[in-house]
């Protein structure tokens, strides 16, 4: 199964990629991830607070990684053809490489925000690896029915992650500074809503039931990716919650703390 991945580099040409209707969404995703990376880099240049620096480093790395993976898909290096149902079906495996690195970084942002213990962080990262890994196995599986078995395992791992965010992390956030609690709740809600949509898109897309065509699936994943990475970062890095208590600047019209959301 995994031997399919090198074939993608050799067997898919630039002409084949640009001739696909999803090409425009990959180009847009590449541009938005690149712009997000540059914005976070510039915004973080004048930051001196040690706590804020950690958040800037992690949060900037997220769209930077996504940019490289979207670029690889755009140029045809992140695509493979998987035979099932009597057809050759295009699967963008680079999407999973993106998620494998970026999703634990997003979880690390949330964990640092609420000062989570190391054991909880390791458990979340482990569950995240299972979530992404089994999703990739499902996407590359040639037996159609087995795809949904792997999807179910991946979704179960995601539900565990969201459970920890909604219950374990929320109780920790509520005992912290008001700006930390309010920012965490906004980011928690954004993460829960967006991450919950991923298995739905997977299920109806080319990896699953094939209800929607690949170009629509690519559009949906691109919107989710940009929102979950760049959108997440914009909320986090505009909040005073990332600064140490002594360093937190006064809120302004453009840089206020995130609004409280339950």
UniProtKB/Swiss-Prot annotation:
Propeptide: 1-13
Segments on the Extracellular face: 14-22, 76-92, 141-147, 205-216
GO molecular function terms attached to this record: light-driven active monoatomic ion transmembrane transporter activity; monoatomic ion channel activity; photoreceptor activity
UniProt key word Protein biosynthesis: no
TM helices/strands, residue ranges: 23-42, 57-75, 93-109, 121-140, 148-167, 186-204, 217-236
Membrane topology: Multi-pass membrane protein
Nucleus among keywords: no
Subunit structure: Homotrimer.
Function: Light-driven proton pump.
Family: Belongs to the archaeal/bacterial/fungal opsin family.
Name of the protein in question: Bacteriorhodopsin
Protein's organism: Halobacterium salinarum (strain ATCC 700922 / JCM 11081 / NRC-1) (Halobacterium halobium)
Gene name of the encoded protein: bop
């Amino acid at each position: 199964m995994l031997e399919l991945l090198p074939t993608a580099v050799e067997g898919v040409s630039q002409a084949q990629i640009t001739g696909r209707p999803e090409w425009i969404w990959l180009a847009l995703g590449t541009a938005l991830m690149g712009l997000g990376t540059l914005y976070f880099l510039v915004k973080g240049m004048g930051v001196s607070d040690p706590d804020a620096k950690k958040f800037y480093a992690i949060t900037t790395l997220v769209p930077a990684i996504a940019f490289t993976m979207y670029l690889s898909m755009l140029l045809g290096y992140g695509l493979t053809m998987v035979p099932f149902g009597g057809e050759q079906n295009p699967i963008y495996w680079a999407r999973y490489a993106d998620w494998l690195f970026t999703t634990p970084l997003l979880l690390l942002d949330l964990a640092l925000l609420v000062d989570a213990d190391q054991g909880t962080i390791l458990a979340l990262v482990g569950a995240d690896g299972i979530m992404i890994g089994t999703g990739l196995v499902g996407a590359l599986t040639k037996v159609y029915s087995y795809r949904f078995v792997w999807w179910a395992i991946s979704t179960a791992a995601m539900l565990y992650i969201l459970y920890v965010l909604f219950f374990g992390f929320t109780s920790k956030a509520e005992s912290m500074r008001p700006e930390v609690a309010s920012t965490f709740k906004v980011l928690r809600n954004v993460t829960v809503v967006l991450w919950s949509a991923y298995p739905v898109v997977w299920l109806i897309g080319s990896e699953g039931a094939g209800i929607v065509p690949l170009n629509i699936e690519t559009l949906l994943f691109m919107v989710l990716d940009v929102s979950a990475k760049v959108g997440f970062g914009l909320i986090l890095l505009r909040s005073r919650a990332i600064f140490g208590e002594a360093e937190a600047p006064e809120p302004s019209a453009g840089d206020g703390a995130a609004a409280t959301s339950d």
